[in-house]
Amino acid sequence: MFCIQCEQTIRTPAGNGCSYAQGMCGKLAATSDLQDLLIYMLQGVSVYATKARELGVINPEVDTFVPKAFFSTLTNVNFDDERIIAYAKQAAEYRESLKNAYEAACEAAGKRAESLPPVAQFVLGTSKPEMLSQAPVALLNKDKNEIHEDILGLRLLCLYGLKGAAAYMEHARVLGKTDAEIAGRFHEIMAFLGEPSVDADKLFTTAMDIGQLNYRIMAMLDAGETEAFGHPEPTVVNTKPVKGKAILVSGHDMKDLELILEQTAGKGINVYTHGEMLPALAYPAFKKYAHLVGNYGSAWQNQQKEFANFPGAVVMTSNCIIDPNVGQYSDRIFTRSIVGWPGVTHVIGDDFSVVIDKALSLDGFQYDEIPHNITIGFARNALMAAAPTVVENVKNGSIKHFFLVGGCDGDKSERSYFTDLAKSAPKDSVILTLGCGKYKFNKLEFGDINGIPRLLDIGQCNDAYSAIQLAIALSQIFECDINELPLNLVLSWFEQKAIVVLLTLLSLGVKNIRTGPTPPAFLTANLAKILEEKFGLRNTTTVEADLKTMLNVA
C-alpha cells in the first residue's frame, strides 16, 4: 500500500504517505492496492481509447465508464473491495473490446497496429488473491528509488488532479452532459500517466492542461445543473430539524435528490440536505417540494456524530463516506453510484423504496427545533445580476476588498484559521465561499454593506466556476487583470477535487493564492518553491500576518 492523496496521510521524517495495513482514512491496504490496480487498468483502457480515436473509433460507453470508475478511487468514496474488483473486470472487458475495434480499424485503413505499452497489455488476475499479488505493478511509487522525488510529486499532482476532474465529469454525466472532445483529451492524459514520465517540463505542462480541461468540465457541469434545475437564487435556509420522519441526502448528486423528493412526495417524510448538498436548496426546481425542509448538520468529517443522531435514513450520493459502524447507523445508511462501504446497502437504479421504507420505520424527529436560518444561492447568475451594485460600492469606497475563502473542510484543529480569517476580515470587505469549507463560518452573522450581504455562499466546490466568472466580469469592468483586483483567494484543501480546482485557477493565470492548513504531502519542498515563484502560491501562516499581506498593511 502507498497512498498520499489526501490531507490525512501520514507524514514522518522517514517519508510521507499511508502504507502498511491501513490508511488514515480507514482504507485497508488491500482496498488501496485494488484501487491502484483499477487505475492501472483504466490507464490501459485509455491507451486503446486514444489509439482507436485516431482512426475514428469512439465508444461513448468507455468515455463515461473510465471517469466514473476513476472517481471511485477518490478519497472517502468506495471502500468495498468487491465493487472495485468489479470495476477492474469491466475495465478489462472494455479494453479488449477497444483492442479489437482498434485492430479492425487498422486493418481497414491498411496500416499496422502499433505495439502498445505494458499498461495496455497487462492481464488482470481472475481472483482477489491473484489481483492483490499483482498490485506491485500498479504501485504509484514503484520506481521511487530510480527517479527524483520531484518527478514522483509531479506525477501524483497530475494523477490526483485528473482524478478530481473525473469526479466532475461523472457529476456532469449524471445530468446528461458529456463532451466527446473533453473525453478524448481525458483519455490522452490518462494514457500519458500510464507510461510513467521522467520529463518534469512535460509533467508540469500536463498539470496545467488538466486545469484547463477541468475549466471546460466545470462549465459543462454548470450548464447541466442550471438547465436541469434553473439558476440558483438567494434563498433563506433553515438548519434545524422539523418534526416528522426524515431522509438525509449527502454528497453532490442533485439528480438523486430530485428522484428522492419525487418518490417521497405525500408520504409524510421530510427531506434534508447535508454537506455539499446544501446548495440544492437554492435551485428553483427544488422549491416546489414543500417536504424539502432544510439542511441538517455540517461538513463530512462530523458525519459519524451527526448521522448517529439523525433519526432517519441517510443516502450517500457521492463522497464523502466514513465508517458508519462507529456511530452504529450502518443499517440505515445507503450508498449510490460510485460510493461503497462493505455491508452497507447499495441502491441500484432509480428506485429508492428501500430508503423510504427504512425512513418510515424509524422515529424521525419528535419536535420542531427553533429555526436557525442562513442565506445561500449566490452562484453565477445571482453574482452577475449583483455586479453593477457591487461595482458602484467598490467605486464609492464602501467595498474595499473581496476574499474567496472556501474549499474542503476537515478535522485538523489548524482549520480554525478559516473561521478566524472570516471573522477578522474588515467590515468593508465581502467574503465569498464555496465547498464544504464554508461550514467553518457559514452560520455566523456578517451583516451587509449597503444591502449586499458580506457573506456570499456561491455553492458546491465545482461552483468555483461561478467565482471565476465573477472575477472575469469585474476585471473587464475595471479594465484590469484578474490579479489586479482587490481579491484574495484562500483555499482549504483536503482531497483531489480541491487539487484540480487549484490547477484550474493556476492554468487561468490566477496568482497569489493561499492554501492550507497544510500543503499536500506529495508536493516536495522544491515543487512548492517553484509554484510559489511561478504563481505566488503559498501556504497559510497566521490570520494576522496573512491579512496584513493581503490588505497591503505595512
UniProtKB/Swiss-Prot annotation:
The keyword Aminoacyl-tRNA synthetase does not apply. Its main location: cytoplasm. The modification Cysteine persulfide is found at C408. GO terms for cellular component: cytoplasm. GO terms for molecular function: 2 iron, 2 sulfur cluster binding; hydroxylamine reductase activity; metal ion binding; peroxidase activity. Its EC number is 1.7.99.1. It is found in: Cytoplasm. Hybrid [4Fe-2O-2S] cluster binds at H252, E276, C320, C408, C436, C461, E495, K497. This is Hydroxylamine reductase. PANTHER family: HYDROXYLAMINE REDUCTASE (PTHR30109:SF0). Binds 1 [2Fe-2S] cluster. It catalyses: A + NH4(+) + H2O = hydroxylamine + AH2 + H(+). The gene is hcp. It is an enzyme of class 1 (oxidoreductase). [2Fe-2S] cluster binds at C3, C6, C18, C25.
